[in-house]
From Swiss-Prot:
The lineage of its organism: Eukaryota, Fungi, Dikarya, Ascomycota, Saccharomycotina. This is Glutathione peroxidase-like peroxiredoxin 1. Keywords: Antioxidant, Disulfide bond, Membrane, Mitochondrion, Mitochondrion outer membrane, Oxidoreductase, Peroxidase, Peroxisome, Redox-active center. Disruption phenotype: Impairs growth and peroxisome formation in oleic acid medium. The keyword Mitochondrion applies. It catalyses: 2 glutathione + H2O2 = glutathione disulfide + 2 H2O; a hydroperoxide + [thioredoxin]-dithiol = an alcohol + [thioredoxin]-disulfide + H2O. It comes from Saccharomyces cerevisiae (strain ATCC 204508 / S288c). CDD domains: GSH_Peroxidase. Induction: By glucose starvation. Belongs to the glutathione peroxidase family. It comes from the Eukaryota.
Length: 167
C-alpha cells in the first residue's frame, strides 16, 4: 500500500505539491467547492490554519466539482475566489475528482484508510475532512456537517504528540 508521503498532487499552477514536505506535520485535507452551502467553512478553515500553522498544522484543499457542479472550472478562478472572499492562505491544489474511475489517487488512499459513517468509503459531498497525523497516518474522517472549529480537540491532541507517539 502506498504511504501518504509518496503522493505529489498538482497545485493550481500545474506544479507538483510533494506530500513528502508535510512530514512531521498534522495535515487536514478537505475537498472544497466555491458555490456550496458549506463554502462558508473556508472562514473557519482559515482560522484554524492561522491559529495552528506555527505549531505544525497544514491544511490542503482539493477543489472538486463532482457534487452539484459547484466549483469554478479553472484553478485560477477558484484561488482568486477563495483569497478575495475568505482570505484563504493555505494551499488550494488543482481541481480533482474524489470518486469514481477518474478519482484522484490521494482520495483513493484517504478513503481506503478511513471509511465514513456506516463504513461507506465514497465521498458524499463537498467539505469532507481527513485528519492525518505527524507520521502520515490518516486518523479520522469528518463529514461536511462537522464544522472546522469542531476539529480543534483532535488537532491539538495530535499537535501535542511527537511523531513517534502518534495514535
Amino acid at each position: 500500500m502506498q504511504e501518504f508521503y509518496s503522493f505529489s498532487p498538482i497545485d493550481e499552477n500545474g506544479n507538483p505539491f510533494p506530500f513528502n514536505s508535510l512530514r512531521n506535520k498534522v495535515v487536514l485535507i478537505v475537498n472544497v467547492a466555491s458555490h456550496c452551502a458549506f463554502t462558508p467553512q473556508y472562514k473557519e478553515l482559515e482560522y484554524l490554519y492561522e491559529k495552528y500553522k506555527s505549531h505544525g498544522l497544514v491544511i490542503v484543499a482539493f477543489p472538486c466539482g463532482q457534487f452539484g457542479n459547484q466549483e469554478f472550472e479553472k484553478d485560477k478562478e477558484i484561488n482568486k475566489f477563495c483569497q478575495d472572499k475568505y482570505g484563504v492562505t493555505f494551499p488550494i491544489l488543482h481541481k480533482i475528482r474524489c470518486n469514481g474511475q477518474k478519482q484522484d489517487p490521494v482520495y483513493k488512499f484517504l478513503k481506503n484508510s478511513v471509511s465514513g459513517k456506516s463504513g461507506i468509503k465514497m465521498i458524499k459531498w463537498n467539505f469532507e475532512k481527513f485528519v492525518v497525523d505527524r507520521n502520515g497516518k490518516v486518523v479520522k474522517r469528518f463529514s461536511c456537517m462537522t464544522r472546522p472549529l469542531e476539529l480543534c480537540p483532535i488537532i491539538e491532541e495530535l499537535l501535542n504528540q511527537p511523531p513517534e507517539e502518534q495514535i
